[in-house]
């Protein structure tokens, strides 16, 4: 696993993970002024993005750089504190937008069921409904090609040292 964090001024640093899996790469794209982290995941020619920011250029550049197809755009919940780029990203790539249970989007999207799984290359992203921050709040569990749990993307359900 290559896990890279990219801050709001474009600096990248590799973050250590205990297990090294060759079929998965994760980048965190962090915007400090909003305290918002988006995630770009690639595996075997496919990609997923979790909670994209409004400016979709950085995601499109990564997709082109890595020569991958964007398969899904995941949203952990409807965001009131920033404008998501999910609609523009979907329009640019034809990738479907995925929300968790109880979401009621006014646009075309997949409203996933609790426990539903989505394949991205050789990895799997599992939907875990976690209402609280919002009723449709969802965390996404990333599993490697062997079905081993690796990390969870919690959106605003969990904050560093706090709950959402």
List each model region and its residues.
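Active-site metal-binding motif and surrounding structural segment of the metallo-beta-lactamase
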Residues: 56-98
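Glycine/small-residue-rich loop that forms an oxyanion/phosphate-binding "nest" at active or ligand-binding sites
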Residues: 98-101, 108-110, 116
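Active-site neighborhood of phospho(di)ester-bond hydrolases with catalytic His/Asp-centered motifs
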Residues: 50, 71-79, 98-101, 129-132, ...
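Active-site environment of divalent metal-dependent phosphoester hydrolases
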Residues: 56-57, 78-83, 104-107, 135-136, ...
């Amino acid at each position: 696993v290559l896990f890279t964090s990219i801050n709001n001024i474009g600096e990248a640093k590799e973050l250590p993970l205990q297990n090294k899996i060759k079929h998965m790469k994760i980048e965190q794209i962090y915007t400090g002024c909003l305290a918002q982290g988006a995630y770009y995941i690639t595996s075997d020619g496919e990609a997923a993005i979790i909670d994209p920011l409004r400016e979709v250029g950085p995601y499109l550049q990564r997709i082109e750089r890595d020569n991958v197809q964007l398969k899904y755009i995941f949203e952990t919940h409807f965001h009131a504190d920033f404008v998501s780029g999910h609609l523009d990203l979907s329009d640019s790539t034809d990738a479907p937008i995925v929300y968790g249970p109880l979401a009621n989007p006014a646009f075309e999207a997949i409203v996933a069921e609790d426990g539903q799984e989505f394949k991205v290359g050789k990895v799997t992203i599992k939907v875990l409904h976690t209402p609280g921050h919002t009723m449709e709040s969802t965390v996404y569990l990333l599993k490697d090609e062997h079905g081993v749990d690796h990390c969870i993307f919690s959106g605003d359900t969990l904050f560093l040292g706090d709950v959402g």
